[in-house]
Amino acid sequence: MISILMPIYNGIEFIEESVSSILNQTYDQWELIIGINGHPENSPVYKIAKEYEKKSGKVRVYDFHTIKGKSNTLNAMIQYCKYDHIALLDVDDMWHPQKLEIQSQYLNYYGVIGSKCIWFGDRPGVIPDIPVGDISNFDF
């Protein structure tokens, strides 16, 4: 089971794609905790996030508009996690539908996990260049 933390400060234009990529995961043992940072409860960002909370019992939205900074927001969000494993999702991220399924299988087998990303903006390609396969701390 995985708690997904999604702090939001800006990026209203990405919320729908990002949250949809979580709702469409093949692995269904997750919760999504959205932390709104820097926006009051009557803001468009907050209202959009609350709509997802209404649509899915797995999504919870919390108001952190008085907390400054992503790190401080993430630290505050951890108290709301139900599960031992935590994944971080930025508002401009989209996850492959099998991301959690594959990573949870790998984590259960190996006990440690890492990932790679694909840039989908104006710089196409895979970044960063991390070797595929078993890696150690020495590979970084």
Task: Please report, for each region that a protein language model flagged, where it lies by residue.
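Nucleotide-sugar donor-binding/catalytic module of glycosyltransferases
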Residues: 1-140
